[in-house]
Regions:
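Residue-level detection of the helix-turn-helix DNA-binding "recognition helix"
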Residues: 20, 34, 45-47, 74
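Short, basic-rich loop-to-helix N-cap that marks the start of a DNA-contacting helix
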Residues: 47-60
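Short, charged recognition helix plus adjacent turn
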Residues: 1-2, 60, 70-85
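A short, Lys/Arg-rich alpha-helix, primarily the initiator
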Residues: 1-21
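Residues that mark the N-terminal boundary/hinge immediately upstream of a DNA-recognition element
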Residues: 14, 25, 51-54, 65
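Short alpha-helical DNA-recognition segment
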Residues: 23-42
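Alpha-helical residues within the helix-turn-helix
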Residues: 20, 31, 60
Length: 85
């Protein structure tokens, strides 16, 4: 399964949107991820790659399930037994 550049950009935008909705600053996210604010900024803007482990950590900080981070809130997924519409 390949992830296109557009899909990655959508995920990054979803991360940014959720972060702002929760009222979290980039500084807060960086502290929670144990990285610098500059490093977090680069992750969110797409200047550096986000590794799978960081995606999982970001989902936890944002208090959402990992598949929802990747696919959005309307995604139907079976893995956790949840159905979202």
């Amino acid at each position: 399964m390949s992830t296109s550049k557009l899909q990655v950009e959508e995920i990054r935008e979803r991360i940014r949107t959720l972060r702002i909705e929760k009222g979290y600053s980039q500084d807060y996210m960086a502290v929670m991820l144990n990285i610098s604010q500059n490093a977090y900024h680069k992750l969110e803007k797409g200047y550096t790659r986000i590794h799978l482990e960081k995606f999982i950590d970001i989902a936890k900080i944002l208090e959402i399930e990992f598949p929802e981070l990747l696919n959005g809130p309307d995604y139907v997924y079976v893995f956790s037994g949840k159905y979202k519409k």
